[in-house]
């Protein structure tokens, strides 16, 4: 919605991501893509970094997302965000498509990549994924889809789970301390990104 784009452009955020994936129903995908392209071109984003989360690799929409974004947006577009990445093969394909469209549409600014790890396979393959393209600028973790890929029940996105914790070592009157159920996955992503 236009008012949300305007609100984002006037915020104190330094990076804005516009969504074509989870927040958009299947029947509204093309309309949303058109609105995002218009927003990138028409709104004064000031010095903000602009990223667009495209549809996932396993859909027929991703190539059209990439093509239209690179054909129809100004150099104001900085990054493409790729959800549910599970292998380096996917990143190779993204790089191949983006490189071809940058050349075809004579884009002068190289587009960077943001990679979202949202599956168990993605976490297992994270080292190869991180090294798959020189365009990779950041790694993200999607806890809800990751939980779904595990078949785990999650009652909240972000924050703590009241049923996940540790007990202190005191044998009597042991106290329960909340823990982050995604700490291990997050730390692996941080280590990989840092390396």
Question: Predicted regions: what is each one?
Answer:
Residues 1-195:
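Expand to "…catalyze enediolate/carbanion chemistry for C-C bond making/breaking, isomerization
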